[in-house]
Amino acid sequence: MKAIVYSQTGDPSVLELVDRPVTEPGAGEVRVRIVVSGVNPTDWKSRRGAAPGEALPFEDVVPGQDGAGIVEAVGAGVQNVAVGDRVWLALAAYQRAHSGTAQEFSVLPADRVFALPANASFDQGASLGVPAVTAYRALTVAEDGPRRLHPGALAGKVVLVAGGAGAVGHAAIQLARWAGASVITTVSGPAKAALATAAGAQHVLTYTDSDIVDQIRQIAPEGVDQIVEVAPAQNSQLDLAVIRNRGSIAVYANNGGDQMTLDVRKHFSLNVRYQFLLLYTVGADVIRAAAEDINAALTDGALTVGEEAGLPLHRVDLAHTADAHALVEGGAVGKVLIDVSL
């Protein structure tokens, strides 16, 4: 089979197209024929490494945490999927050398494989994983919020999504709307505002406006209940100014820097909760619950992709995976997909 591998960290040129053997799944594993692979920032960050020359944990690595395809074989004890099922994958490559989705067949643990609803496309499935599960987690950690999402779970809540044109922001808007929240989102300009509006946000604001706090307070006079935050260092003062008493701020990225300063007394007085989250260490039970509720949203038609849904798709074939990584690393707006097989 054809696969993309890298044997050293570096820029996209370290990615190579090679032939690898198709392997059989062991106990608790599934072999999936990958149709579409989704590319996320975590993929290029792992490939580039934290520092020049950083050693890999394996001799070589197949990249790609997310994807969608068809189950080809199952190992002993697998009950959640069967041969022939259409599925989506999450965290496929985590702590595994050759389970990534940038290859024609992936063998991976069954608990990273989820049935894809009949009404959902492979493009939708490959666009879930990291973005949708991250968004789900961010929406279910509030002190006064739900632990699971379903229609009505966020009824009466005001959710502020920072960066509504990003992949996580897009999923957060759609999941929050499906769960009944009123959604405010902030973006950098008109083009991204159009995408966030298409995703379903009722209120789309430009975060560079000098009166952004007043604009948010006009929409939510008592403050927002939950914030899905992509840039905590950049937005900490804004978040403090608009969060309500007992509100929660879920941080999933470090856009704008790793260091932030908080006014402790003001956060005391508001009983603010900061929740930092990383999918790799969040726990299998959280991932499983997220997948169940994400599938319910998919079945309801609430998680859609494409420019008309606020998430433009950019496509390359497997041989040009380096181009896909370069697009994501360069900040392409939307979702970058790799067509792996038919």
Predicted regions located by residue number:
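Glycine-rich phosphate-binding loop and adjacent beta-alpha segment
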Residues: 234-303, 340-342
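Glycine-rich beta-strand-centered segment in the early N-terminal region that forms part
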Residues: 21-39, 51-94
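Short amphipathic alpha-helix with an adjacent loop that forms part of the alpha/beta core around
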Residues: 211-221
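Short glycine-centered segments of the SAM/dcSAM-binding site in methyltransferase folds
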Residues: 86, 158, 182, 247-248, ...
